[in-house]
A protein has these predicted regions:
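Short, cysteine/histidine-rich loop/knuckle motifs that typically chelate Zn2+
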Residues: 37
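Short microdomains enriched in Cys/His and/or Lys/Arg
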Residues: 57-71
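Bacterial N-terminal signal peptides
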Residues: 2, 6-14
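Conserved beta-strand positions that form and line the central face of beta-propeller blades
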Residues: 54-56, 78
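Flexible coil segments in periplasmic/lumen-exposed cytochrome c-class electron-transfer proteins
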Residues: 19-22, 32-33, 41, 77-155
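Non-transmembrane alpha-helical segments in soluble domains
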Residues: 27, 67, 71, 121-128
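Electrostatic cytochrome c docking/interface patches
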Residues: 15-31, 46-50, 65, 112
Length: 155
């Protein structure tokens, strides 16, 4: 039984460590895109630059919907698009930039830093696997900041 228990612990540890690079790359893409500028480090959103951002922890959007939102943003809101090819053809909601001529209020906003396909998938996987439906934890806080900080106190 001791051997089986040790094997179980080893397999579980390996599985947890295998997810660490995915978490790190997804978090890196989240930071590169400056998602925390609106959605905050914790992913709960709230007031920020340009208004209140959606809580990524409480969103009901599925993976494909999240990919579309990250790639294309949300016209008429402060959610920018992160795919540098967005709105150059009709891949985003069947619309092109020309559809917004004379309508600057609803024109999609460019991200300050574009993400490539791999980064977009990584940030969406990070949202789905590490934020969506989960509470903010001290462990997550320490992973986000790379060390314990005052933000982690009280979690």
């Amino acid at each position: 039984i001791k051997i089986l228990l040790n094997m179980f612990v080893y397999i579980l540890s390996y599985a947890l460590l295998a997810d660490a690079p995915k978490f790190d790359y997804g978090l890196s893409a989240y930071k590169k895109g400056n998602c925390m500028g609106c959605h905050k480090w914790h992913g709960d959103g709230g007031p920020g630059y340009g208004g209140a951002a959606l809580s990524l922890r409480e969103t009901g959007l599925d993976r494909e919907q999240l990919i579309t939102i990250v790639e294309c943003g949300r016209p008429g809101t402060n959610m920018p698009f992160f795919d540098k090819k967005a709105y150059k053809d009709d891949r985003c909601f069947g619309m092109k930039f020309s559809d917004f001529e004379g309508d600057d209020k609803n024109r999609p906003l460019n991200a300050k830093s574009y993400l490539n396909k791999r980064q977009i998938n990584a940030v969406v996987d990070f949202i789905v696997n590490d934020l969506q439906g989960k509470k903010v934890s001290k462990e997550y806080c320490i992973k986000f900041f790379g060390k314990p900080t005052r933000s982690c106190d009280g979690l």
